[in-house]
Amino acid sequence: MSTSDWSSINGASVPKEDPSTEPFAITAPPKTDIWRRSETDDVFNAPTVFQELPASQFKSIAVTVYAPWHTQYDQGGLVIAFPSSATPSPERETKKAENESPENPVRPSKWIKAGIEFFELSAVLGIVGTDRFSDWSLAPMSQEFHQKARFKIERKEKTLWIYAAQDGVEKMKPMREIKWAFMEGRDEEKLWVGVYAAKPTPEDGEDDEKGLEVTFSDLVIEKEE
């Protein structure tokens, strides 16, 4: 898997080394998120590194996520998204300057994210499925291993299963089943498969422009031949 297979949006940079063999990091500036509260509150401005492929070829993606989470809604993890016809192409977004302030140029029609999120003073395992609007599920993390976890999104026929394992736990556990992912002809559509980092809440005081650096390792993507 070469770096030429990858694209980036919202200020992220494609890693210089192969992401499947070398750890890499994404830094999210404040006021970035992936979240759709309503038709008029639709945000997809989080820095993201991904591959675009036919949805019919997707089998699974897995990655290990780490960061010093400490501000409300700090987050990072896996994301898969169906870009809408109005979504800018990844080629055009990749060429944007790295220091450009993320506005909100990208609005995929449907998406799923799974990762660690900091919520009410604790890191949690968070999963969001967005068909029409976003819904959010949480699971607690142990205080001993609260900064690092591994996630996997796997396709089983028309359904997606999401698995997670905290650092220090060998076996991944099923966290959520999403039935709608590949229904309604979405097998014929393009799919973005990758990782993201987001920091919806700025730091307090003089650090209000400080970003969140999320490190990803052991990234694996499986595709149908």
Regions flagged by a language model, labelled:
Residues 1-225:
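Extracellular glycan-recognition regions
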